[in-house]
Amino acid sequence: MAIKKYKPTSAGVRGMSVLSFDEITKTTPEKSLTVSLNKSGGRNSYGRVTIRHRGGGAKRKYRIIDFKRNKDGIKAVVKSIEYDPNRTANIALLQYEDGEKRYIIQPVGLKVGDVVESGADVDIVPGNALPLRNIPVGTTVHNIEMKVGKGAQLVRTAGAEAQLMAKEGKFAQLRLPSGEFRLIHLDCKATVGQVGNISHELVTIGKAGRNRHLGKRPYVRGSAMNPVDHPHGGGEGRAPIGRPAPSTPWGKPALGLKTRKKNKKSNKYIVRRRKK
């Protein structure tokens, strides 16, 4: 999708850009594939904030996405390409030969009228889903399962892609967008191609109001707070941190601290850690 830039007619639109949405063919979602979405405002069941900077935003309906791609051997036609407010990628509405409709994440190049399918022996074309053991080495993939039959969990955001590097024993080795090399079972499914809406990362928000529409609240610097609210707070004017290293609001090290568990069970599947 192309990027549309605005003339600086006001401070709000100066430098602002939006996606052109020229790929979108339908503006209203398939009603049978949507459910209501209750907002939490970042609060848990006790009403306490557990994730900061969330709240407000436009009302949304959640689109039910088919991450399992388990209708093997049944062809589907792409009926429409739609916008999904719940994710960065666009979604494609499929209609199968038996009449069932499902949403999938739109890969690059998938358009209305294309035919896609899933199964062990389908063609290697964008949008088709098949087990990793049947995908040639060097192929670009997305929507990758981590456990057989659980549904895709990896490489789902706009513009993301992974590459199948090798196969050995029961596992395939993939290079993920982070640079991590990871082992995935050969029976796990993946979808051929790169996730669409590549231009998403080039969008400039431009003004605070657009972030509020997305449900994002302001991120306040610790140095702008009082000492009671943050370890960086207080002082006269622009005071330094006053500590050996930056801290989180709860007093823990903010930079450089490893947050992954050292003895995590899945560590054995990581061949090479991600690039920093």
UniProtKB/Swiss-Prot annotation:
<dbReference type="Pfam" id="PF00181">
    <property type="entry name" value="Ribosomal_L2"/>
</dbReference>
<keyword id="KW-0689">Ribosomal protein</keyword>
<dbReference type="InterPro" id="IPR002171">
    <property type="entry name" value="Ribosomal_uL2"/>
</dbReference>
<dbReference type="GO" id="GO:0019843">
    <property type="term" value="F:rRNA binding"/>
</dbReference>
<dbReference type="GO" id="GO:0002181">
    <property type="term" value="P:cytoplasmic translation"/>
</dbReference>
<dbReference type="InterPro" id="IPR005880">
    <property type="entry name" value="Ribosomal_uL2_bac/org-type"/>
</dbReference>
<dbReference type="InterPro" id="IPR014726">
    <property type="entry name" value="Ribosomal_uL2_dom3"/>
</dbReference>
<dbReference type="GO" id="GO:0015934">
    <property type="term" value="C:large ribosomal subunit"/>
</dbReference>
<keyword id="KW-0694">RNA-binding</keyword>
<comment type="function">
    <text>One of the primary rRNA binding proteins. Required for association of the 30S and 50S subunits to form the 70S ribosome, for tRNA binding and peptide bond formation. It has been suggested to have peptidyltransferase activity; this is somewhat controversial. Makes several contacts with the 16S rRNA in the 70S ribosome.</text>
</comment>
<dbReference type="InterPro" id="IPR008991">
    <property type="entry name" value="Translation_prot_SH3-like_sf"/>
</dbReference>
<comment type="similarity">
    <text>Belongs to the universal ribosomal protein uL2 family.</text>
</comment>
<comment type="subunit">
    <text>Part of the 50S ribosomal subunit. Forms a bridge to the 30S subunit in the 70S ribosome.</text>
</comment>
<feature type="region of interest" description="Disordered">
    <location>
        <begin position="218"/>
        <end position="276"/>
    </location>
</feature>
<dbReference type="Pfam" id="PF03947">
    <property type="entry name" value="Ribosomal_L2_C"/>
</dbReference>
<dbReference type="GO" id="GO:0003735">
    <property type="term" value="F:structural constituent of ribosome"/>
</dbReference>
<dbReference type="InterPro" id="IPR022666">
    <property type="entry name" value="Ribosomal_uL2_RNA-bd_dom"/>
</dbReference>
<keyword id="KW-0687">Ribonucleoprotein</keyword>
<dbReference type="InterPro" id="IPR014722">
    <property type="entry name" value="Rib_uL2_dom2"/>
</dbReference>
<dbReference type="InterPro" id="IPR012340">
    <property type="entry name" value="NA-bd_OB-fold"/>
</dbReference>
<keyword id="KW-0699">rRNA-binding</keyword>
<dbReference type="InterPro" id="IPR022669">
    <property type="entry name" value="Ribosomal_uL2_C"/>
</dbReference>
<dbReference type="InterPro" id="IPR022671">
    <property type="entry name" value="Ribosomal_uL2_CS"/>
</dbReference>
<feature type="compositionally biased region" description="Basic residues">
    <location>
        <begin position="258"/>
        <end position="276"/>
    </location>
</feature>
<dbReference type="GO" id="GO:0016740">
    <property type="term" value="F:transferase activity"/>
</dbReference>
<protein>
    <recommendedName>
        <fullName>Large ribosomal subunit protein uL2</fullName>
    </recommendedName>
</protein>
